[in-house]
C-alpha cells in the first residue's frame, strides 16, 4: 500500500456543531474559495491544511478566522524548513545523501534535529514573535526536535509558512482559540465573552487518521489487529510496519518523502525478492511494535537475495 501516511479524514465529535445552520466541510472536501467571496468562514485546525485553506479563502475575498485547537509548530518553508536537507546541496551524490540520512541512529538524529530546530527558530524569530503577539500558541515538537519528528511520529502538527502566518500576524486573518468558544450556534461560534463570531462556512481542518484505520476499512478487523499500528517509532526505533514485512503475508507499506521512498523502496524490493526465493518467511511474527529480534535475519536475507537475484539477472540491483 502506497497510500501515504494518512488516509481517512478525522472528524472530531463536537455535538454543538449540529446547531450551525451554515455549510460544514472537512478539509478533504474543500475545493475552492471563490464560492465564498464576501462570506465569513471559520477554519478549525492550525496545521498545513488549516493554514492553506484559510489563505486560499482570504485570497478569494472571504473574511476568515482561524480557530487553533492546540499549539502548532510554525516554520518558514524557505530556508528554515529546508535545513534538514542541507546535505543534499553540499556535493555528495543523491544516493550517498539518502544512505547517510537513513543510516543515522535515532538518538543521534534527535539531537541533530534539536540543533536544527534552534537554528530555524533564530531564522524565523521575527515571524514567531509576531505570532506570539496575536496569541498564536507555538511549540517546537517533543523536546524541541522540530517538524520532521512531528511528521515521523504523528504525521502533522506543523505548518510550512508560505504566507498565511504573515496574514495572521497582520491580523488580515483572524485568530481565536478553540477553548475560547463556549458553543456553536445557528449563526456561528458563541465565544465565552458572549460575542458571536458569525460564519457562513466552517471548515474542519482536523487531520486524518493513520493507515491502520484504512487497513481496517479495506481488509477487516482480523487483518488490522494482526498488523497493528503503522508509522511512528516502535521499540526497535524504526517506523512501525513501514518498508518491511508485516504480520499479514503479502501486505507491505511504503510512505514518506522522496528521500525516504527512494532508498527504502529498494530495501522493500529486496525483502519481497527474499520472500519469493524462500529466504525469508512471508510474514513477520511476534509483537507488531518491534522487529528488533529478527533484524539480523532480515539483513542476512537482504544480502543473500541481492547476490542470488543479481547473479541470475532477475532483479535490478539498487544504483
Per-region residue spans from a language model:
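Flavin (primarily FAD) cofactor-binding/catalytic cores of flavoenzymes
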Residues: 1-42, 46-48, 55, 59-70, ...
